[in-house]
Amino acid sequence: MDARMFGLETPRVAALHHLLDVPDGDKAGGGATRTYVRDARAMAATPADVKELAGAYAFVVDMPGLSTGDIRVQVEDERVLVISGERRREEREDAKYLRMERRMGKFMRKFVLPDNADVDKVAAVCRDGVLTVTVEKLPPPEPKKPKTIEIKVA
């Protein structure tokens, strides 16, 4: 059932609905698909900072306790930056959890890149549990010079 029907729409939920809007033909029986719900939860649990720098865009995501093998950075559909992965629970035979507050499971964020982003120049660095993905900007286009038309005498 859609939360909007009960007046429970918050700005965060509205943003998720906008970002993850599924075409009507992709919904089974008018409800959200399992993939849609899973992706919405993964995106809501992955906050990020996006900065515009002089020559690049920077996407900063906290990734405490994850190794680079647990994180994927991809560009899909030519203009969508996807940061995803999975945080797994540490399993030990000689220990049991008394409290589990850290989020486990899959995480994901998608960002539509601006037209001036150079998708061939993407770099990712993970330092001290913080992932920074840098996407360089394309150089600005050269201004078009006016074309001079020769005037003929008739």
From Swiss-Prot:
The keyword Nucleotide-binding does not apply. Residues 39-154 form the sHSP domain. GO terms for molecular function: unfolded protein binding. The keyword Zinc does not apply. It is found in: Cytoplasm. Induction: By stress; by heat shock. PROSITE patterns: SHSP (PS01031). One of its GO terms (cellular component) is cytoplasm. Pfam families: HSP20. Coiled coil: none annotated. One of its GO terms (biological process) is protein complex oligomerization. Keywords: Cytoplasm, Stress response. Its main location: cytoplasm. Belongs to the small heat shock protein (HSP20) family. This is 17.0 kDa class II heat shock protein. The lineage of its organism: Eukaryota, Viridiplantae, Streptophyta, Embryophyta, Tracheophyta. The gene is HSP18.
